[in-house]
Amino acid sequence: MAAPRLPQLPPHDGPMLSVVDMHTGGEPLRIVLSGAPAPEGRTILEKRRWVRENADWLRKVLMFEPRGHRDMYGALLVPGDEEEANIGVLFMHNEGYSTMCGHAIVALGRFAVDYGLVNAAQGPETAVNIQCPCGLIRAYVSYTGGRSGSVRFRSVPAFAFATDVTVDVPGYGKVVVDIAYGGAFYAFVSAETFGLDVCSSRTRDLVDVSAAVTESVKAQVKLNHPDSDDLAFLYGTILTDGKDSYSEEPTANICIFAESQVDRSPTGSGVTARIALQYHKGLIQLEQIRTFKSGATGSLFTGKAVKETLCGNFKAVVVEVSGQAYYTGASSFVIENKDSLKDGFLLK
């Protein structure tokens, strides 16, 4: 019997984009291999700005239907501008471009090792320095028997921006939230405030509440970041189970970010921010490991504060987050010029 032939596309016009797909805790990551324009700019924030203003078609083509879906997440690899960086990355989603994404870092750590983007891999861990728009992230990829595995990474300085902030949320009244930064800014509030449970309530109800909180915080709270105004925006709202005091038992949360996008993982940058918040409140100590459970899939990350530092005038911590990513496939996408839906679309 002859070996099966790999599927081949017939002749077509328009560009072709090659990608590798992975997931971390159920949250997808689509990594662009080829076909994307080379972003202009000296710094990674300038490259992010250039892509947003000049090549947003790439995000829409790969994230939106019919090639993606409204909860797809992507990564475009770019040269880093820091000497220590092995790779740089721009993150993309249904609304635009993030500054940090922990689940993507876990996946990209494996990817960088497996695709030879770092020096020869060696056990028990191989270091991968990934420059994100928020700064340099140091990832450590377990490596045994020629196979990459779990990944841990150390965050940029994470801090509590404001605690016990009262915002008026239409339809819900006055709601008290905390705001923290873990590479991106999040609002945190217990789902119990709204009579919901992060693990058992309908996803639609969790999304509606989170979206309302996000819009209210955006309208009523001015954020700032010591390093750049490009970092000073609210990425989303994380609903928690309210179990913030230290425990060996997992604590659950669910993150609704960007344009009501639901994170299937426990949210790496959200775990970072939540650890920083718990440390700020004196609920945990350095090196105390907490386990975080996704309310969407039940997948787990672990996190701990490893050292104190500063971010401008904010007292901050460096947080270590650990997780596992898996490959799901590799694809080539085409854009046929006569296709009226070639640019992508989203259903709401």
Swiss-Prot record:
It catalyses: trans-3-hydroxy-L-proline = 1-pyrroline-2-carboxylate + H2O. The active site is at residue 101. Pfam families: Pro_racemase. Keywords: Lyase. It is an enzyme of class 4 (lyase). GO terms for molecular function: hydro-lyase activity; trans-L-3-hydroxyproline dehydratase activity. Its EC number is 4.2.1.77. Substrate binds at residues 102-103, 263, 268-269. In contrast to the T.cruzi proline racemase enzyme, lacks the conserved Cys at position 267 which is replaced by a Thr residue, transforming the racemase activity into dehydratase activity. Belongs to the proline racemase family. Homodimer. This is Trans-L-3-hydroxyproline dehydratase.
